Amino acid sequence: MNLSPYNDKKIKVILHDGSTFEGFATHNSFEYSYAEFGVDAECLQLGEYLIRDEEIESVELLESPASIRNTEEEMAMLFSVRRSFSEHLKRWEDNELPDKYDNNCFEYSAQPTQEEFERALNYQKERGDSFIKLEGDFPLADDFGLDSSVTLTMQLTGPTDRWIVNDEIEIREPGYKDIKEIELKHYGPLYGEDFAVRNINHLFEYLDFRGAYIGERLVGAYYFYSSDGYTCVDGLIVDEDFRCRHIATTLLKHAVSEASGDVVFLHADQDDYPRKIYEKLGFAEVDKLYEYLSTEK
């Protein structure tokens, strides 16, 4: 099978045993040296998975109309591979950052059975993970005793000309050292410095960042991903020592301007205060993600 046309494409690989893997692919052939992996033929690499041509039943290009959901899926696949797991569950897996809940979860298409949930729980335990996360487009009738939350997708629907901005601020691409410092200050106490550093390294490798500077000090930042006329703005953070100085709105206005006519959207916890701020700025709810999490060991 000629696998070269699938290089750097978003694909679904179906194996002879019926299992599936979805993500961005890299084509590797026998011309490369993969002896350490036992690979001596053409293969596709999706994340940490190397799939030889002899295992492959078929390959499908995941081509869908441009939309917010398609952009969200592409952004997720920068980090994780989605693979079949059970009748009602698919598994998102990021082996570079296996302890990040959002990148290593189970996506449900219908109410999972108790047997499916227990299998997923055992899978997590076998990996050495102390958490399990389920997510989907609708609330579960049986949440298996997990803590629930809802993340909103919010699309900008109004103008930005009345947004108050801070003229002291210069927006530019931040250096890694600056991003690491502000992320550690904000997230280190919440998640631990080790995880915070590994997470920012992961994000910095795959996404574009913009930072708000007052002088040479980074006082706020966000990252973004654009695809087919849609731009997702995420990871908005403001230095706690510089709150109430319109830094967030200055950053968001720059993001909208740089998007150059794209549909701009972001995410907010349904029950958190930032949602109200976004609504005042003209962002409106267009989608929901229902999430269920347990971090008990």
Regions found by a protein language model. Give the residues of each.
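A short beta-loop-alpha structural element at the N-terminal edge
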Residues: 67-72, 168-181
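N-terminal charged segments
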Residues: 64-127, 192-193, 197
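Conserved acetyl-CoA-binding loop-helix of GNAT-fold acetyltransferases
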Residues: 114-121, 238, 244-257, 276, ...
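Conserved RNA-binding domains used in RNP assembly and mRNA/RNA metabolism
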Residues: 1-67
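Acyl-donor-binding surface of acyltransferase catalytic domains
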Residues: 109-169, 174, 274, 292-294
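Conserved active-site alpha-helix within GNAT-family acetyltransferase domains
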Residues: 138-148, 249, 270-288
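A conserved beta-strand-loop-helix scaffold within acyl/acetyltransferase catalytic domains
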Residues: 192-239
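Conserved acetyl-CoA binding element of GNAT-fold acetyltransferases
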Residues: 100-110, 229-240
